[in-house]
């Protein structure tokens, strides 16, 4: 393809609104353009990258016998009302009415749609297991879209759904999809980790995230420095062995703390380490007031709390509501004397304390020497891990310390179980002739997000550096002067030879200075650049490998074989 015919509007300056490297370069190199906050047009170069990503995905889906199909982006609200997500998904769900005053949504994901399809079409276990998928635009009304393609209101996603007659079928589908995702991300040339993830609004019992380490990543990944353990910070666990309190129980005492509002203030006043104090944080979980207690040196992990309660929503309680229910405001809360209507959850580290201090549920007052089951009834079923791990904590396997890094979520796989099939009536007759709920899995890849993830990991100070597997073109032929007959001849000859070998070639036939051409070539990041210059009359050209920025002079007759080898080396 001739570059003069390509819509590739490169920019000389980085737009001010672009905060991260991938956003800056995709704008500057003419890959994307914003049309509204969180909504982008994909220009020809970006569309070619997307096409190649989608091809790799389709090839790996074919290997596990997944069926590609397509369902509407606009969905009747009734399905989501039946599943319960119409209300619980939150303000990110686009809702609207048609001219007949019927409620509709723009799909952020399609569990309900595919489940209803299977409920209508599959009646016997003999038709299972089955995996279906689509590649399609999704919509999420993000409160604050940012970082280019990393957090948008419209995005492209591959979403797959497996349907099995039993748990073994789900486990096999989950394993097959995990292997397929590994193959996909390997072929894309990405560095990534498979980590323990949170199912979130999807529901389900088990999930695994695929995270690409990158400075622009909004997720914090906790990983062991000695083993392969890694988890999203929301789900990460540290190593802790429960122990029974053996200290002699001291007399409960209430003390005045009028100026101590934080755990640090109280620790200083009492001359106690923070791990001998507890903090009590109030939440509202599905309209129920919940008090969560942790030791003073840890923060409450809201995701763990919400998952433990199986709550559709969990938000921090308003201080006015807390004061009305408990009789005190923030800074003076504790587990002693809580009203019966307040559910008490206690982190396991806090549950093992004796003679500890906490707020007295009275402004400006604290208790010291609190002991469980003397001063506060503690139910074993309300004790669990409700804390957020810290960097340097011992990993859950006990073999390494936790380190933190930033990551971009590029894929997520879930074991949904019967969360949707039970609600939407997706049942089959089993081998005993009994009706049984279909067991489901859900599997997503952020296709458009992958553009940014690859750009974040592969770019350098000069521009983008695409792996050959997804580059918009394989080869960039750059004649210095198209008016020079030898250069024009060699450029055309090379294009013909390389295209005949099945390579995709971009020829810079523009009437621009050499410096402009080279800068644009580095910026758009094709794997191989062939410069046709002053030695064209000798049939000699310069081949540059973009990933390593190495230059090799060679004869035209050597180019095809050499470039094939170099491209294979540029796959990652």
From Swiss-Prot:
Consists of three domains: the N-terminal catalytic domain, the editing domain and the C-terminal anticodon-binding domain. Pfam families: HGTP_anticodon, tRNA-synt_2b, tRNA_edit. Keywords: Aminoacyl-tRNA synthetase, ATP-binding, Cytoplasm, Ligase, Nucleotide-binding, Protein biosynthesis. GO terms for biological process: prolyl-tRNA aminoacylation. The gene is proS. Its EC number is 6.1.1.15. Its main location: cytoplasm. It comes from Leuconostoc mesenteroides subsp. mesenteroides (strain ATCC 8293 / DSM 20343 / BCRC 11652 / CCM 1803 / JCM 6124 / NCDO 523 / NBRC 100496 / NCIMB 8023 / NCTC 12954 / NRRL B-1118 / 37Y). It catalyses: tRNA(Pro) + L-proline + ATP = L-prolyl-tRNA(Pro) + AMP + diphosphate. GO terms for molecular function: aminoacyl-tRNA deacylase activity; ATP binding; catalytic activity, acting on a protein; proline-tRNA ligase activity; transferase activity. This is Proline--tRNA ligase. GO terms for cellular component: cytosol.
């Amino acid at each position: 393809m001739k570059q003069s015919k390509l819509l590739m509007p490169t920019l000389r300056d980085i737009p001010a609104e672009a905060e991260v490297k991938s956003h800056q370069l995709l704008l500057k190199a003419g890959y994307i353009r914003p049309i509204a906050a969180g909504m982008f047009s994909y220009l020809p170069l970006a569309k070619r990258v997307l096409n190649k990503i989608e091809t790799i995905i389709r090839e790996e889906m074919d290997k596990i016998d997944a069926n590609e199909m397509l369902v509407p982006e606009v969905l009747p609200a009734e399905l989501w009302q039946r599943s319960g997500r119409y209300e619980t998904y939150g303000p990110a769900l686009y809702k609207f009415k048609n001219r007949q005053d019927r409620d509709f949504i723009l799909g952020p994901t399609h569990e309900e749609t595919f489940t209803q399809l299977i409920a209508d079409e599959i009646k016997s276990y003999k038709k299972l297991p089955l995996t279906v998928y689509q590649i399609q635009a999704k919509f999420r009304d993000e409160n604050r879209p940012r970082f280019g393609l990393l957090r948008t209101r419209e995005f492209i996603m591959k979403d797959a759904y497996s349907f099995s007659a039993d748990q073994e079928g789900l486990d096999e589908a989950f394993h097959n999809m995990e292997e397929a995702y590994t193959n996909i991300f390997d072929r894309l040339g990405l560095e990534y980790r498979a980590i323990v993830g949170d199912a979130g609004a999807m529901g389900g019992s088990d999930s695994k995230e695929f995270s690409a380490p990158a400075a622009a990543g909004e997720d914090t990944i906790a990983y062991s420095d000695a083993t392969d353990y890694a988890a999203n910070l929301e789900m990460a666990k540290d190593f802790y062995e429960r122990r029974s309190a053996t200290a002699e129980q001291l007399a409960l005492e209430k003390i005045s703390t009028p100026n101590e509002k934080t755990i640090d203030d109280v620790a200083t006043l009492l001359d106690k380490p923070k791990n001998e104090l507890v903090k009590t944080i109030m939440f509202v979980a599905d309209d129920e007031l919940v008090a969560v207690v942790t030791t003073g040196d840890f923060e409450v992990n809201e995701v763990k709390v919400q998952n433990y309660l199986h709550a559709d929503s969990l938000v921090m309680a308003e201080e006015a509501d807390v004061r009305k229910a408990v009789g005190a405001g923030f800074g003076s809360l504790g587990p002693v004397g809580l009203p019966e209507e307040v559910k008490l959850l206690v982190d396991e580290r806090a549950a093992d304390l004796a003679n500890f201090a906490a707020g007295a549920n009275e402004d400006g007052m604290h208790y010291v020497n609190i002991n469980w089951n003397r001063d506060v009834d503690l139910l074993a079923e309300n004790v669990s891990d409700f804390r957020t791990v810290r960097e340097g904590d011992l990993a859950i396997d006990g073999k390494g310390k936790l380190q933190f890094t930033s990551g971009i979520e590029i894929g997520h796989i879930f074991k949904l179980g019967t969360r949707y099939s039970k609600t939407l009536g997706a049942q089959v007759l089993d081998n005993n002739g009994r009706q049984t709920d279909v067991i489901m899995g859900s599997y997503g890849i952020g296709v458009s997000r992958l553009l940014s993830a690859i750009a974040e990991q592969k770019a350098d100070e000069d521009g983008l550096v695409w792996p050959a597997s997804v580059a918009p073109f394989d080869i960039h032929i750059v004649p210095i002067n198209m008016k020079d007959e030898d250069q024009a001849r060699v450029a055309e000859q090379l294009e013909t030879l390389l295209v005949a070998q099945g390579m995709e070639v971009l020829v810079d036939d523009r009437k621009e200075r050499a410096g402009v051409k080279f800068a644009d070539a580095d910026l758009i990041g094709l794997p191989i650049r062939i410069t046709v210059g002053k030695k064209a009359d000798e049939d000699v050209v310069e081949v540059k490998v973009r990933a390593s920025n190495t230059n090799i002079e060679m004869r035209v007759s050597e180019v095809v074989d050499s470039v094939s080898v170099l491209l294979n080396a540029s796959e990652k």
